[in-house]
Amino acid sequence: MEKSMMGFLENTELLTKEGVLSLSPLVLAFIGDAVYSLYIRTKIVAQKNQPVNFLHKETVKYVKAKAQAESVKRIYDLLSEEEKDIVRRGRNMKSNTTPKGVEVQAYRYATGFEALLGYLYLAGEFERLKNILELSVQVIEE
């Protein structure tokens, strides 16, 4: 299932690397949120054929801001300088959204993480995207 999802993502029409870098970090995070959510939901459904309420609860463990923030902090040293810059830009971007039920710092790190995923996806760096997604899941499951 995971392999077919990555194949689906790889077949989308993408921007040039320069075009991706010109996007706002919040736009990258917007895309990254969708990519991460689809990845996690696909992974959970492939593992467990359960009622939707159960699937939702399992998904939240991975996609909540606190989990994403912890994940990006733990893998930060494994990122390239360019990837670290994307995370920093996303983390430092001011948003009009007020985080609910999470500290502002965790929310900002989660935004940085999602910006990185959006960047990798739109830049067509699918192997690296898959690597980061897998590392993130490992960190959260520890």
UniProtKB/Swiss-Prot annotation:
Keywords: Cytoplasm, Endonuclease, Hydrolase, Magnesium, Nuclease, Ribosome biogenesis, RNA-binding, rRNA processing, rRNA-binding. GO terms for biological process: rRNA processing. The active site is at D33. CDD domains: RIBOc. GO terms for molecular function: ribonuclease III activity; rRNA binding. The keyword Transmembrane helix does not apply. InterPro entries: Mini3_fam, RNase_III_dom, RNase_III_sf. Its EC number is 3.1.26.-. It is an enzyme of class 3 (hydrolase). Its main location: cytoplasm. The keyword Cytoplasm applies. Belongs to the MrnC RNase family. Involved in correct processing of both the 5' and 3' ends of 23S rRNA precursor. Processes 30S rRNA precursor transcript even in absence of ribonuclease 3 (Rnc); Rnc processes 30S rRNA into smaller rRNA precursors. Homodimer. This is Mini-ribonuclease 3.
